[in-house]
Amino acid sequence: MAESKLVIGDRSFASRLIMGTGGATNLAVLEQALIASGTELTTVAIRRVDADGGTGLLDLLNRLGITPLPNTAGCRSAAEAVLTAQLAREALNTNWVKLEVIADERTLWPDAVELVRAAEQLVDDGFVVLPYTTDDPVLARRLEDTGCAAVMPLGSPIGTGLGIANPHNIEMIVAGARVPVVLDAGIGTASDAALAMELGCDAVLLASAVTRAADPPAMAAAMAAAVTAGYLARCAGRIPKRFWAQASSPAR
C-alpha cells in the first residue's frame, strides 16, 4: 500500500483532510466539526484573525492540537498577498501560508498572473507556499516550478458545492505533479471528496461543505470517512472498465 501519511514540505500528517474555518456559525459547532474530521491542519484567514483578535479561534486550534495554516483570503494583488503572508508569519510564528489571490468577488477565481507573482516572492522570502489555483495543468506546473510545496486546484468555485467540474484536468495535474496535489474548493458532499482522492489527489481541503451543512459535525465525520475511502480505493486499484458484461463466476 502507498505511504499512508500526507507529506508536505518537511512535515507529515496522519489525516489527508484539511479543514477550513470560514462559514462556521460559532466556535462550539466548529470545535465539534474539527474533532469529528480528525484534521491536523486547518486554515485561518489572517484578516479575520486581525479583525476579531483571533484569540478564540487560535486558542481552540491550540487546545485541539491542530496546526493553523494562515491564508491570504480576500487579497486581490500579489503585493497585498505578500504583505498579508508576512503579517501572518509575525502573528502566528509560521512560514507556512495558503496563498490566495482572487480576481473578483463574484467568481472568487484565482488571478493566475498575480498568483504566480506572489508565489515567486514568497518562496524567495522563505515561505512554504500552498497556492489555491485553477484546474489548469499548465498553471499548476508553473506554480510548482516556482518552488511551491504543493498545488491546490479547485474542483469548482468556492462555496458552490458543485463538486469536481473537470475531473480530467485534475487527473492531468496529478499526473504531472512532483509535489502533493490538494483538491481545494467546490466540494459539496462526501462523494466529491472520495472522487478527489480516487483521481489521485493527496488530500482534500474544504470548509463550506462542513460549516454550512445542516449538521456540521456529522458532515465532517462523513468527509473524513470519504477521504479515507477514496484513498484506500485508489491504492487498491479499481477494476478496468469494460464495454460488455463479464460474469464474476466462471461458466461451467
Swiss-Prot record:
Which segments does the entry list as coiled coil? none
Q: Does the keyword Ligase apply?
A: no
- A Pfam family assignment: ThiG
Q: Which SUPFAM superfamilies match?
A: ThiG-like
Which residues act catalytically here? K98
Reaction(s) catalyzed by this protein? Answer: [ThiS sulfur-carrier protein]-C-terminal-Gly-aminoethanethioate + 2-iminoacetate + 1-deoxy-D-xylulose 5-phosphate = [ThiS sulfur-carrier protein]-C-terminal Gly-Gly + 2-[(2R,5Z)-2-carboxy-4-methylthiazol-5(2H)-ylidene]ethyl phosphate + 2 H2O + H(+)
GO cellular component, as recorded: cytoplasm
Reading the lineage from the top rank, the first entry is Bacteria
Q: What is its EC number?
A: 2.8.1.10
Instruction: Name one molecular function that GO assigns to this entry.
Output: thiazole synthase activity
**Predominant location of this chain?**
cytoplasm
> Assembly state and interactors?
Homotetramer. Forms heterodimers with either ThiH or ThiS.
What PANTHER family has UniProt attached to this entry?
A: THIAZOLE SYNTHASE
Its function, per the record, reads: Catalyzes the rearrangement of 1-deoxy-D-xylulose 5-phosphate (DXP) to produce the thiazole phosphate moiety of thiamine. Sulfur is provided by the thiocarboxylate moiety of the carrier protein ThiS. In vitro, sulfur can be provided by H(2)S.
What does the sequence similarity comment in the record state about its family? Belongs to the ThiG family.
Q: What is this protein called?
A: Thiazole synthase
Q: Which organism does this sequence originate in?
A: Mycobacterium bovis (strain ATCC BAA-935 / AF2122/97)
Lineage per the UniProt record: Bacteria, Bacillati, Actinomycetota, Actinomycetes, Mycobacteriales
